[in-house]
Amino acid sequence: MKTPFERLALYDINASIKEGSYVAVIGHTGSGKSTLLQHLNGLLKPTKGQISLGSTVIQAGKKNKDLKKLRKKVGIVFQFPEHQLFEETVLKDISFGPMNFGVKKEDAEQKAREMLQLVGLSEELLDRSPFELSGGQMRRVAIAGVLAMDPEVLVLDEPTAGLDPRGRKEIMDMFYELHQRGNLTTILVTHSMEDAAAYADEMIVMHKGTIQASGSPRDLFLKGEEMAGWGLDLPETIKFQRHLEAALGVRFNEPMLTIEDAAAEIRALFQGEKTL
């Protein structure tokens, strides 16, 4: 039913993500990031166009028999993934996904043991209720449940929400290690410019339901004024770099995307490898 109050959550979306890449989708609140990610495994279906993952295609207006295949290939870790826990024990919770896709119980339980170790938890937790664990442990158990389904694509929707800086770094480092070890395609939806700069190969910038820009963190973070127009800030390290350049009258060749980048550039400057 048409209405003058109709509003499109997404429009003119045309993007291609390389297999094995780590892509950050960034945008201000309400830009359409979370709506986009829910299309990636068929939680939402497109009203126009199509979504393709390898040979799996979901088309608008058609009965799509490949939804189950798509949902196995694309694992989503939502904000506060611990809210997804529901089983009596950690073992049952992690095993549920694989068994739902037809994996035998004993194989699913073996996969659960492997995934629990992969996320840095002890097998001693397998028989415990997930609701007896600490918040950080619950989050890792929920992540293990997603990984147990052997996804080809891992979508992370603000996965560090509610964590302190140390916990956030631990979780993000873990995802990056999993990305490299498992040759996963990883899509990070985030408000954190620091996380996008530190981990992503490519970035997609969303604003008001459409894609405004895409490219490497290096290239996009050089467009400070455009980023501000899309309601986005720069990483703190790049802000620091600009203040330093203004104060010392120098110009660094590369943007300082991380603290490590900043330390290396400053060290080179004061050791005389860069001239004022």
Swiss-Prot record:
Pfam family name, one: ABC_tran
Q: Where is the ABC transporter domain?
A: 1-233
**GO terms of molecular function:** ATP binding; ATP hydrolysis activity; ATPase-coupled transmembrane transporter activity
Please give the start and end residues of each transmembrane region. none
Gene3D superfamilies, sorted: P-loop containing nucleotide triphosphate hydrolases
- Please tell me where ATP binds in this chain: G27, H28, T29, G30, S31, G32, K33, S34
**Record SUPFAM superfamilies:** P-loop containing nucleoside triphosphate hydrolases (SSF52540)
- Cite the EC number: 7.-.-.-
UniProt keyword DNA repair present: no
Among PROSITE patterns, the record links this protein to: ABC_TRANSPORTER_1 (PS00211), ABC_TRANSPORTER_2 (PS50893), CBIO (PS51246)
Q: How does it sit in the membrane?
A: Peripheral membrane protein
**Function of the molecule:** ATP-binding (A) component of a common energy-coupling factor (ECF) ABC-transporter complex. Unlike classic ABC transporters this ECF transporter provides the energy necessary to transport a number of different substrates.
Q: How does it assemble?
A: Forms a stable energy-coupling factor (ECF) transporter complex composed of 2 membrane-embedded substrate-binding proteins (S component), 2 ATP-binding proteins (A component) and 2 transmembrane proteins (T component).
Q: Which family does it belong to?
A: Belongs to the ABC transporter superfamily. Energy-coupling factor EcfA family.
Q: What is this protein called?
A: Energy-coupling factor transporter ATP-binding protein EcfA2
**Source organism of the structure:** Bacillus subtilis (strain 168)
